[in-house]
Regions:
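Short, low-complexity N-terminal tether/leader segments at secretion or assembly junctions of large
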Residues: 1-35
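Beta-strand-centric surfaces of beta-sandwich/beta-rich domains
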Residues: 2-9, 34-139, 146-269
């Protein structure tokens, strides 16, 4: 194998020690990863066409009851422990409102339209007066304050049923929800999951996934007792388009929990 030195601009002589460099490339030969601290900067920066990094995270400050609960802000309210997947079978416009009149800045929603294609919508809050958007939503994967101020009160997003489908906790500026739906035309590859239980009590935290038209089932999890755990998959877990992902916990009441996971979306084309 011929080797060329950039600094001296010449090929190495025969018999010179040979070095090899390994890199990961996509099907078109584009480098998509190397090793080291800067390995995924091109991916995070959006420089790789057809590849998207997704980081999801959620927190639950006080579980209600001892049954399963999705790790999201809504789970702190009685009756909202599990994310209401049955209530979002039909797509609809959404209504956004705060419980504090001081919230009059913009909220941006990210999620999927009626065809499960990615879309965004920015809605200007009018405090405690509900505002209805114009786009139709099948899933909302994220909500965040995109104006000039962080939210003072709790921001609630409801669909047409009306059911709470996303919340932004007061003074957080971003939804805290450990669930996600893979967009149409993409495949998700799960690299890492982090789970934390802060209280001195036992809890089971598990990731559930539901392929389109299928049922939720556990794809990974852990038992914790005032500890944290990170799972790094040597071979990523594959999620097909329109798969719903939901990180849930079960254990004693008033648990304080958090979870996060990282996906790489790859265009199916």
């Amino acid at each position: 194998m011929a080797q060329y030195r950039i600094d001296s601009q010449e090929y190495l002589a025969n018999g010179t020690t040979i070095f090899e460099a390994n890199m990961l490339a996509d099907k078109n030969g584009n480098i998509i990863n190397t090793f080291g601290n800067a390995s995924n900067i091109p991916l995070a920066n959006g420089d790789l066409e057809g590849y998207t990094a997704v980081h999801k995270f959620g927190a639950l400050d006080g579980t209600v009851g001892t049954g399963w609960s999705t790790i999201w802000t809504g789970g702190e309210t009685t009756g909202q422990q599990l994310y209401p997947w049955p209530a979002i079978v039909d797509a609809s416009v959404v209504t956004v409102v705060s419980d504090d009149d001081a919230d009059t800045t913009d909220v941006t929603l990210e999620g999927l339209d009626t065809n499960y294609a990615f879309q965004t919508e920015t809605i200007c809050l009018t405090g405690e007066t509900p505002v209805t958007g114009t786009k139709t939503w099948h899933r909302i994967n994220r909500a965040f304050m995109s104006g000039t101020a962080t939210n003072v009160g709790t921001i609630v997003v409801k669909n047409a049923t009306p059911t709470v489908i996303t919340e932004i906790k007061a003074e957080r500026g971003q939804s805290l929800q450990a669930f996600y739906t893979v967009p149409a035309g993409s495949t998700g590859f799960l690299n890492t999951v982090q789970m934390t239980a802060s209280k001195n009590q036992a809890v089971e935290i598990a990731m559930f996934a539901r392929p389109f038209g299928g049922a939720f089932r556990v794809v990974g999890g852990v038992y914790l007792f005032q500890s944290d755990h990170t799972i790094e998959y040597a071979t990523p877990i594959k999620f097909t388009e329109k798969t719903d992902i939901d990180v849930r916990a079960i254990g004693a009441a008033n648990g304080v929990l958090s979870a996060a996971f990282d996906l790489i979306l790859v265009d199916n084309a």
